[in-house]
């Protein structure tokens, strides 16, 4: 068995034993660069080659920024990290780049939590909240594909959210412990089995699932977590006679290999000597910290810390895992106090390129991750729930993130002040090859806005076009959705409480025409590619603030720029400075495009794109993953070092099948089971309220209301409530609140 030789040379991870030559990046597209694209591509490529560390691509909506990214990556040939501000945009980018690079590795890396409750302590009520989570196996598979691809080839594009700045374990251990099975190299079957166990594969001779292997005589079947199909290894003595990919159901051989690496079943694997050293250093830190607490007369905290740490050490020594093992990551990695964790970025070669999409949102997001994570853990440390080393289980600080990336390209229609300040090369991409103009903008009074909006919506629906409506709050979005439903309009809403994969599905239903209107807040701004949308309505446009500043308004206006009949209506009583600046900038871009169209004889026409998204990735994953979501304990081999990448992104567990609503699933349950569920949820609701987790309490309250309505029989509003539930298909808990009319100015 040839193991991977791993070493750091000048900061770069060197890998050996990977079979096959490098494949160059190759864009497959019927189109050639046009409009502003050729100059933008040339300038960006030259900037990278000249050594410019920071560049900005100011590209308007619909100008083909993704195509420009693809052609730039093709010309440079560098492994590339593409970062997006949320999972929805990451999904869209991954899908588009996969179309451009069908013969290269385009992989998706986001937080794999469907639900995540972090460990926390509330001193005011003396309440300790244990960590709880539910993991999406399809997304976990895609994460493993990302790291496996990075260690196997150079033609890799990873599309990621800020999850990529959170710790996932050492790449040296991950690559160094992976067995490289080669027919030419002697290998005993038992040695191979022991190697699989060391990299956290579980033996299961009856049910071959991801992360497991089975043994039948001299045949060992392994199902890597990153693979679409299991691998079969046939032995004869110390010879490997067959290495093949097989169909997991029929056992049919799909492809044969001469050699292949088997990457670990977990991103966090570690050598036994490191574990022993970690046990010693954890014990020493505990002894020191307990003495500090006793010296300040914090006897309860000292006793609590000693008891918890002793238990964790015993579990680590005997079982190899413990609850909350991620809090000991610094010791297990062998890092010094304050040193940053290993992240996905450490799996990239030294000459990587980083493209940050919608940089005006993503950059501040990266900046804020560290402090938000630290504030919660400081409380745990101060009250004796965790050792101080738990603070080193954290995301990267912004300066640490920048230090790991050799070159950046910031992409946005409205770059932030930081990007513009550090940029060494500003590139504008204003002209759209399609000739599409920025939308016309109409400012209308607030009085009568809802009646006016209904009329505009019905006009678009008659033309089989779609409408986006942006509000300022979640409550306003939900109330407006209910009002439009009552008016007979097919509508849904989307905000931060909407589960991640549900967002993708909701956008898909909008494009397919299953709904005509989508109501949202800031999720309807950056990057959404919706050519069917011909109208964007901005309510309360004159309310200055984060959601109605110049950048936000320009981004929102851009959602109507992919349709030849695009129009924006701002409902406002006064024209604010932000509104005026956004309107003027839109008009400037519109005039540039009109001049280009006139010069080249172009007639603007809406480009109808195929309705693709990350669900294509998920569909492939679902072929081999049975469960939609699962709870997972913390262990050395089971993803213990992951933390959610976006505040509020976790949502609730996706346990409802996509084709079945919550109401349909509940209707299949017996009456007694529904009563038990309600009682349990009411208790959880009270506990959440006592812990001051009011958002969780409100979510549970809405679910209780919905189920109780089913138990007590349908009300006179049964039809409306059923419509509301169907409109929220895919969300684990649809809103159960009964609205008493829409609270808007009529």
Task: Locate the predicted segments by residue.
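Walker A/P-loop
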Residues: 50-73
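Conserved helicase motor "Helicase C" RecA-like lobe of SF1/SF2 P-loop NTPases
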Residues: 171-176, 471-501, 706, 710
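Conserved helicase ATPase core of P-loop NTP-dependent helicases/translocases
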Residues: 478-479, 492, 498-521
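Conserved pre-motif I regulatory segment
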Residues: 8-58
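Pre-Walker A (Motif I) flank of P-loop NTPase domains
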Residues: 49-56, 77-79, 154-156, 465-466
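Conserved Walker A/P-loop ATP-binding site and its immediately adjacent core
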Residues: 75-99, 105-114, 163, 472-475
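N-terminal cationic and glycine-rich segments that engage phosphates or anionic surfaces
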Residues: 13, 109-158, 162-452, 456-462, ...
């Amino acid at each position: 068995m040839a193991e991977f030789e791993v070493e750091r040379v000048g900061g770069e991870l060197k890998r050996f034993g990977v079979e096959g030559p490098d494949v160059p990046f190759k864009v497959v597209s019927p189109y050639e660069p046009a409009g502003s694209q050729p100059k933008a591509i040339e300038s960006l490529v030259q900037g990278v080659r000249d050594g410019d560390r920071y560049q900005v691509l100011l590209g308007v909506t619909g100008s083909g920024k993704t195509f420009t990214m693809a052609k730039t990556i093709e010309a440079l040939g560098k492994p590339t990290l593409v970062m997006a501000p949320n999972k929805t945009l990451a999904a869209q980018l991954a899908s588009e780049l996969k179309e451009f690079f069908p013969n290269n590795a385009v992989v998706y890396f986001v937080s794999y939590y469907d639900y995540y409750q972090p460990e926390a302590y509330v001193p005011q009520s003396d309440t300790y909240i244990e960590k709880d989570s539910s993991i999406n196996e399809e997304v976990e598979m895609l994460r493993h594909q990302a790291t496996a691809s990075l260690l196997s080839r150079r033609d890799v594009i990873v599309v990621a959210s800020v999850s990529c700045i959170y710790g996932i374990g050492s790449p040296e251990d991950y690559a160094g412990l992976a067995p490289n099975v080669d027919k030419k190299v002697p290998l005993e079957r038992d040695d191979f089995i022991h190697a699989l166990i060391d990299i956290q594969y579980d033996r299961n001779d009856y049910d071959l699932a991801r992360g497991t292997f089975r043994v039948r005589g001299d045949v060992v079947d392994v199902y890597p977590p990153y693979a679409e199909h299991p691998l079969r290894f046939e032995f004869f003595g110390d010879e490997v006679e067959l290495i093949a990919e097989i169909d997991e159901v029929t056992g049919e051989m799909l492809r044969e290999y001469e050699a292949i690496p088997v990457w670990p079943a977990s991103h966090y694997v570690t050598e036994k000597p490191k574990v022993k050293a970690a046990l010693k250093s954890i014990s020493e830190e505990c002894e020191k910290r307990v003495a500090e607490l006793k010296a300040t007369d914090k006897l309860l905290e000292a006793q609590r810390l000693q008891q918890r740490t002793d238990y964790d050490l015993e579990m680590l020594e005997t079982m190899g895992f413990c609850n909350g093992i991620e809090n000991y990551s610094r010791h297990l990695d062998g890092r010094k106090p304050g040193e940053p964790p290993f992240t996905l970025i450490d799996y990239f070669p030294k000459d990587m390129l980083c493209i940050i999409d919608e940089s005006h949102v993503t950059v501040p997001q990266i900046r804020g991750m560290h402090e938000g994570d630290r504030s919660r853990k400081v409380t745990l440390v101060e009250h004796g729930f965790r050792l101080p080393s738990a603070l080193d289980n954290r995301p990267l600080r912004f300066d640490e993130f920048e230090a790991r990336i050799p070159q950046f390209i910031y992409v946005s229609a409205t770059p932030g002040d930081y990007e513009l300040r550090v940029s060494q090369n500003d590139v504008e991409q204003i002209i759209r090859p399609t000739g599409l103009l920025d939308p016309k903008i109409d400012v209308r009074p607030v009085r009568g806005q809802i009646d006016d909006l209904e009329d505009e919506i019905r006009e678009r629906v008659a033309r089989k076009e779609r409408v986006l409506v942006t509000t300022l709050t979640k409550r306003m979005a939900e109330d407006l959705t209910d009002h439009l439903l009552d008016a007979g309009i097919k509508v849904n809403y989307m905000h931060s409480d909407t589960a991640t994969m549900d967002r993708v599905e909701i956008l898909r239903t909008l494009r397919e025409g299953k709904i005509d209107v989508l109501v949202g807040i800031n999720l309807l701004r950056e990057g959404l590619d919706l050519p069917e949308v011909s109208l964007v309505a901005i309510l309360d446009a004159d309310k200055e603030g984060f959601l109605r500043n110049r950048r936000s308004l320009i981004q929102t206006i851009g959602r109507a720029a992919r349709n030849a009949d695009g129009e924006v209506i701002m409902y406002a009583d006064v024209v604010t400075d932000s509104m005026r600046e956004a309107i003027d900038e839109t008009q400037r871009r519109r005039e540039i495009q009109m001049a280009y169209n006139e010069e080249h004889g172009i007639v603007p026409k809406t480009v109808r794109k195929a309705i693709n998204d990350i669900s294509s990735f998920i569909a492939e994953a679902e072929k081999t993953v049975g469960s939609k979501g699962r709870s997972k304990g913390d262990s050395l081999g089971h993803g213990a070092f992951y933390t959610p990448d976006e505040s509020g992104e976790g949502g609730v567990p996706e346990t409802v099948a996509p084709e079945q609503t919550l109401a349909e699933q509940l209707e299949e349950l017996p009456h007694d089971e529904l009563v038990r569920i309600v009682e349990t949820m009411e208790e959880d609701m009270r506990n959440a309220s006592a812990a001051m987790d009011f958002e969780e309490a409100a979510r549970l309250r809405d679910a209780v209301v919905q189920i109780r309505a089913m138990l007590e029989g349908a009300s006179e509003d049964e039809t409306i409530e059923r419509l509301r539930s169907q409109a929220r298909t895919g969300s684990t808990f649809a809103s159960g609140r009964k609205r008493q009319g829409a609270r808007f100015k009529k």
